[in-house]
Design a protein with these regions (language model features):
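Interfacial loop-to-helix transition and helix-capping segments at the boundaries
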Residues: 4-5, 34-47, 126-138, 175-195, ...
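Functionally critical transmembrane alpha-helices in membrane proteins and complexes, commonly lining
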Residues: 5-62, 80-83, 317-320, 324-325, ...
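Membrane-interfacial alpha-helical segments at the cytosolic side of multi-pass membrane proteins
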Residues: 17-22, 54, 58, 88-92, ...
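Transmembrane alpha-helical segments and their boundary/interface "anchor" motifs
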Residues: 44-48, 61-97, 107, 111-115, ...
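Structural signal for the C-terminal ends of transmembrane alpha-helices
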Residues: 59-65, 95, 148-157, 198-208, ...
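Membrane-interface helix-loop-helix regions
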Residues: 79, 83-144, 157, 167-179, ...
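Alpha-helical transmembrane segments of multi-pass integral membrane proteins
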Residues: 239-257, 265-373, 392
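Membrane-proximal cytoplasmic C-terminal regulatory module of class A 7TM GPCRs
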Residues: 334, 374-415
Length: 415
C-alpha cells in the first residue's frame, strides 16, 4: 500500500462522480437529473473534492522537491500533455464534422487561443474547448500563488490564507473589471500569457523572489474578474476566491496532519471556508449538502488513510486527469450514435451507459499510458539533470512531512 493511496482514492471517486453526473441526464432524463440537483449537486461536490486534494498535494510536492525549477518541470509535464491531447482529439472530431467549436471561441478566437495557453479560459471569459477545462483555471492560479508564497518563505501560513480568501470573498468585488469587452479580454489573455512566461523565465534564471512577486499577482485576477462573461462557469469573483480558499483548505489539512499548524487554527480556517461556501450560496439549498458531502468523504478517507484503499478507486485516481478531461468528448458523440438516448427503453439506456463508461475508461487509460506516463518520466529525467548540474534554486525545507509522503509518490498526482 502506498501512503498516498487515500488521495488517489479521493481523486478516483471525484472523477467517476463527474462522469456519472454528466451522463445522468442521458440515462434518467433531464427532469430527474435536475430533481437530484435541487438536493445535492454531485458535479460541484466532485470538483470541490478535486480542489481539496490539489490543495493537499501541491504544497507537499513543492516542499518535497525544495526547488521551484523541479516543481514546474514536473507540473508542466504533468498537466499540459493530456490537456493538449484532449484539444487535438476534439479538433480531429470537429474536422470530421462530429463536433463543433464553442460559440465564444469562434467569436473571440484570439482571446480563446491565448487563454488556452495559460489554461485560464474561465478568467478570460471564453469557454474552453471542452467545458471542464474551467477548473484548470483555478488550478493554475493556485500553482502560481503557492509558488510565490514559497519563494518568499510565506508558505506555512496556510490557515490564514484559507480564511482570508473566504472572508475577502464577501467584499463587494467587481466581476468583470478586466474583461467587460472583447478587446479587454484579448488584452487580459495576452497579459496572462506574458505573466506566466515571465514567472517561469525568472524561476529558471534563479530569480525566485522576483518570480514570486509576479506569481502572487495572479490572485488579483479572480478577485476582480471572476465572471467576465456568460461563457464563464464560475458566476462571480466571490465564487472564484472561494474556490481558491477550498484549495488552501486542503493545504491546511496537510499542515495540520504534519504538525505545522495547531488544531485550533486548522479548525477555525476550515470552518470559515465551509461557512463561506454555504453562505455565498444561501439561496441554493443544495450547497449545504455539497459541503457536508465533501467534508464527510474527506474525513472518512483521512481516517482510513493508513489502510488499504479499494484498488478500483486508486486505479481511477491514477487515470483521473485524462478521464476528467476526455469523458465529455465521448459524451458529445452519443447523439450521433443513438439519438435521444434519454427517451429510449430502459434496457437500451443501460447498455448505452455501460458501453459509454467502458469507452471513456479505456480512452483515459490509453491517454494515461501513452501520454501522461511518458511525459512524467521525461519530467523526472529533466529534473534529475537539473540536480546533476547542481543548479537547482535552494529553497527552505519544511519537510516534516517526509515520513508521511514516501519517495516518488508525487508521480501519480493529478489535478
Amino acid at each position: 500500500m502506498r501512503r498516498l493511496d487515500w488521495l488517489d482514492a479521493l481523486r478516483g471517486l471525484a472523477a467517476i462522480t463527474v462522469v456519472l453526473f454528466h451522463l445522468s441526464p442521458q440515462m434518467i432524463g433531464n427532469e430527474a437529473h435536475l430533481a437530484v440537483m435541487r438536493h445535492i449537486d454531485l458535479g460541484k461536490t466532485a470538483v470541490l473534492l478535486f480542489f481539496l486534494v490539489s490543495g493537499y498535494v501541491i504544497p507537499m510536492s513543492l516542499e518535497r522537491h525544495g526547488s521551484l525549477r523541479r516543481f514546474w518541470i514536473g507540473r508542466l509535464l504533468r498537466i499540459y500533455p493530456a490537456y493538449l491531447a484532449t484539444i487535438a482529439l476534439f479538433a480531429l472530431l470537429a474536422a470530421a464534422g462530429l463536433l463543433h467549436w464553442q460559440g465564444s471561441l469562434r467569436a473571440e478566437t484570439g482571446a480563446g487561443l491565448l487563454a488556452h495557453v495559460t489554461m485560464m479560459t474561465d478568467l478570460v471569459g471564453v469557454r474552453g474547448v471542452v467545458r471542464v477545462f474551467w477548473t484548470l483555471t483555478y488550478e493554475m492560479v493556485f500553482y502560481l500563488v503557492v509558488t510565490g508564497l514559497f519563494a518568499w518563505r510565506l508558505h506555512r501560513h496556510s490557515a490564514w490564507y484559507a480564511a482570508a480568501l473566504a472572508l475577502i470573498a464577501w467584499l463587494p468585488l467587481p466581476d468583470d473589471l478586466l474583461g467587460s469587452t472583447p478587446a479587454s479580454r484579448r488584452a487580459l489573455a495576452g497579459v496572462l500569457v506574458l505573466g506566466l512566461l515571465l514567472t517561469l523565465t525568472l524561476i529558471f534564471a534563479g530569480r525566485a523572489k522576483a518570480a514570486g512577486v509576479v506569481a502572487m499577482a495572479f490572485v488579483l485576477v479572480p478577485a476582480i474578474n471572476g465572471h467576465p462573461t456568460v461563457a464563464g462557469t464560475v458566476r462571480s469573483s466571490q465564487q472564484a476566491l472561494l474556490l481558491l480558499a477550498v484549495m488552501f483548505a486542503g493545504t491546511v489539512i496537510y499542515r495540520w496532519q504534519h504538525g505545522q499548524i495547531g488544531p485550533a487554527a486548522g479548525s477555525v480556517a476550515l470552518a470559515v471556508v465551509a461557512a463561506g461556501l454555504i453562505g455565498a450560496q444561501w439561496t441554493q439549498r443544495a450547497w449545504p449538502a455539497n459541503v457536508f458531502a465533501v467534508a464527510t468523504i474527506s474525513l472518512i478517507a483521512y481516517a482510513f488513510r493508513r489502510r488499504s484503499m479499494p484498488q478500483t478507486l486508486t486505479w481511477l485516481g491514477r487515470i483521473s486527469y485524462s478521464l476528467y478531461l476526455q469523458h465529455v468528448i465521448v459524451l458529445f458523440l452519443l447523439p450521433h450514435i443513438i439519438p435521444d438516448v434519454g427517451t429510449q427503453p430502459l434496457p437500451v439506456r443501460v447498455i448505452t451507459g455501460l458501453t459509454y463508461l467502458a469507452t471513456v475508461l479505456a480512452l483515459a487509460w490509453l491517454s494515461y499510458r501513452i501520454v501522461e506516463q511518458p511525459a512524467q518520466r521525461l519530467g523526472r529525467r529533466l529534473a534529475a539533470k537539473i540536480d546533476t548540474r547542481g543548479r537547482p534554486h535552494p529553497q527552505p525545507s519544511t519537510q516534516r512531512a517526509a515520513p508521511g509522503t514516501g519517495r516518488g509518490e508525487n508521480t501519480r498526482e493529478s489535478v
